[in-house]
Swiss-Prot record:
Residues the entry annotates as binding Mg(2+) 2: D225, E226
Gene Ontology MF term list: anthranilate phosphoribosyltransferase activity; magnesium ion binding
Name of this protein: Anthranilate phosphoribosyltransferase
Record organism: Legionella pneumophila subsp. pneumophila (strain Philadelphia 1 / ATCC 33152 / DSM 7513)
Reactions catalysed, as given in the entry: N-(5-phospho-beta-D-ribosyl)anthranilate + diphosphate = 5-phospho-alpha-D-ribose 1-diphosphate + anthranilate
UniProt cross-references to InterPro entries, sorted A to Z: Anthranilate_Pribosyl_Tfrase, Glycosyl_Trfase_fam3, Glycosyl_Trfase_fam3_N_dom, Glycosyl_Trfase_fam3_N_dom_sf, Nuc_phospho_transferase
Subunit (UniProt): Homodimer.
Gene: trpD
Residues where 5-phospho-alpha-D-ribose 1-diphosphate binds: 80, 83-84, 88, 90-93, 108-116, 120
Pathway: Amino-acid biosynthesis; L-tryptophan biosynthesis; L-tryptophan from chorismate: step 2/5
Function: Catalyzes the transfer of the phosphoribosyl group of 5-phosphorylribose-1-pyrophosphate (PRPP) to anthranilate to yield N-(5'-phosphoribosyl)-anthranilate (PRA).
Amino acid sequence: MKPKLLFEQLLSRQDLSSDQMQEVIHACMTGEFSDVQIATFLALMRMKGETVNELTAAAQVMRQLAHKIDLGNPLIDIVGTGGDGRNTFNVSTACSFVVAAAGIKVAKHGNRSVSSRSGSADLLEQAGFILNLSDSQVQNCINQCQLAFLFAPHYHPAMQHARAARQQLGIRTLFNLLGPLINPAQVKRQVVGVFSTNWLKTIATVLANLGSERSLVISSQDGLDEISIAAKSEVVEYRDGNFKQWFISPEDYGLKHSSLDAIIVDSPEQSLHLIQSVLSGDSGPARDIVLLNSAAAIYCAKDGISFDAAIEEARIAIDSGKANLCFNKLRLLTQTLNKESNHE
């Protein structure tokens, strides 16, 4: 599709067909479009608003171009779209250790920051984790720690063609929405946080279109892309072919309604400090938001468990020291695996 025709169509607020969307995403991902053309496309899509069909088609192309990894199933991913502009610490990354410590295998798909102050990869590298691992090393992480981090650039090398355009734009784009939809381990269960309640049903429907067995898509009424401690959060749950809407407030589960101020960070260092505090058992707003969001993943991963019981499992995973042990064990394992591969 010629860029000029594409831009005219989007300027007139006409949606793209699935075929058109696949063609355009392929052009973006193979270097056919220039940085300016990619940025223009992303900005116009943002202005028009991305549809279920467009996102499904885009994710299908991204999955086809990805380097896939088979880590077995069941697996879960906990991920946010970002783009909420709130600069909270890396809640979903912290939750990964808690959920793994609760006995659930987690394939956490993440990247460096594009529009926030601390992406999951920025945080993990600050903590000393080695992210550039081979497939067999990643499998080793899952086997030994129930958790592996899938560094997006390694599995989606085609994304390099859009990186400059995304960084120069510096705003939420289509790719924030796509990130949670293209886990290279092809997880069947996911908790996805989105930056606006307007996107809940859209993202849940796209996940269903892409073969998800069960998903929770979450957004809080204060604009956080996860369950909030400062406001009611809305959930669209997909399970057994059906969608269900429900709400979560911290008070419903014996947790305090708190300001977000205590969980705002300016850097990966600050985010790491908060995560280590939570995993060490410290109480406060950071712990509460990790409990709520870890519980969402445990609830999504386990059949027949209540949300109350999931919160208790998350609490035990932290207070027993298992979540902190998972953090330290996985960090050491990634370092050891990296040294071994360097000596081969």
